[in-house]
UniProtKB/Swiss-Prot annotation:
It comes from Wolbachia sp. subsp. Drosophila simulans (strain wRi). Gene3D superfamilies: Nucleic acid-binding proteins, Recombination protein O, C-terminal domain. The gene is recO. GO terms for cellular component: bacterial nucleoid. The keyword DNA damage applies. This is DNA repair protein RecO. Belongs to the RecO family.
Length: 240
C-alpha cells in the first residue's frame, strides 16, 4: 500500500540511532504515523509544525509503515525564540497527536491549522484569536460544537456572560447571575471569536480567560473520554 500527501509534523520521536517515528497531520489521510530515516543533515527537517511532502508505504494499511519525506516549508524557526508562540504550536500539535483518530481525514481542521501557522509565523497581532478559533474548531470537528449563539435558558442573544460547563451553551447575565459560581465566564474575546471576528487584539489576560474555557471543554469532551492526560504544555499557557 502506498500514498502521497502533504502533512504537518505534530510529533517526532527517535527510534534507535538512525530512525524516527514521525506523526503527521496530513491533508487527505488524517493523522498518520510512520518510520523515517535520520541522516546527519535531516534534523532540521523534522521540527514540529514543518510542512512536508510525504510518501507513505506499508504492506498493510494497519501497519506502522515508512515515510519518505521532502521539506516543503520550515516554520518552527520563525517563532522558536518567542516562548508563548512556540509553546502554543507544540501544545496544539500534542493535542492533535493525542485526540485525533488515526487515518480519518479532517481537511477543514488541517487547512485551518496550516493557516494558523502562517498567521503566527508572520507575526499577525490577532494570532491569539485565531488560536482560540482553532480549539473551537477542533471541538466542532470531533463532534462537540459549543453553542454560544444565544442563552440556553431564555433564547436571548444579548448580554451573554456565562457558559454552562454541563452543556457548553451560553447563558445570559440575567439568567445566570444567581448561579454564577457554578458557571464558566464567557469572555468578550471568545464571544468575538465564536462570531468569526478574528482581527481584534486583546490583553493576554483576556486570552487566558478564553483558554480556560476552551481548555475545560477539550479536557471534558476529549481527554477524559479517551482517558488521556491533558497536556502540561497547554496548562503552562495559563501560567506564563
Amino acid at each position: 500500500m502506498r500514498w502521497k500527501d502533504e502533512g504537518i509534523i505534530i510529533a517526532a520521536k527517535k527510534y534507535g540511532d538512525k530512525n524516527l517515528i514521525l506523526s503527521l497531520f496530513t491533508k487527505n489521510h488524517g493523522k498518520r504515523r510512520g518510520l523515517t530515516k535520520l541522516t546527519n543533515n535531516s534534523n532540521y527537517k523534522f521540527q514540529i509544525s514543518n510542512l512536508l511532502h510525504a510518501e507513505w508505504s506499508a504492506k498493510l494499511p494497519e501497519n506502522l509503515g515508512f515515510f519518505k519525506c521532502e521539506l516543503i516549508e520550515s516554520s518552527f524557526h520563525h517563532f522558536f525564540q518567542d516562548r508563548l508562540k512556540s509553546i502554543t504550536i507544540v501544545s496544539f500539535s500534542s493535542i492533535l497527536e493525542k485526540v485525533l483518530p488515526e487515518s480519518e481525514p479532517c481537511a477543514v481542521l488541517y487547512d485551518n491549522f496550516r493557516y494558523f501557522i502562517d498567521v503566527i509565523k508572520h507575526n499577525n497581532q490577532s494570532w491569539q484569536s485565531h488560536y482560540l478559533n482553532l480549539e473551537l474548531l477542533l471541538l466542532t470537528q470531533l463532534g462537540f460544537k459549543l453553542d454560544l449563539s444565544k442563552c440556553a435558558v431564555t433564547g436571548v442573544k444579548e448580554n451573554l456572560q456565562f457558559i454552562s460547563p454541563k452543556t457548553g451553551r451560553a447563558v445570559s447575565k440575567k439568567a445566570g447571575d444567581y448561579y454564577a459560581d457554578k458557571l464558566l465566564p464567557f469572555p468578550q474575546m471568545l464571544h468575538d471569536v465564536y462570531n468569526n471576528n478574528l482581527q481584534n487584539s486583546y490583553s493576554f489576560q483576556e486570552f487566558q480567560l478564553g483558554l480556560k474555557v476552551t481548555g475545560y471543554f477539550l479536557n471534558k469532551y476529549l481527554f477524559l473520554q479517551l482517558n488521556v492526560k491533558f497536556p502540561e504544555l497547554r496548562n503552562l499557557m495559563l501560567s506564563l
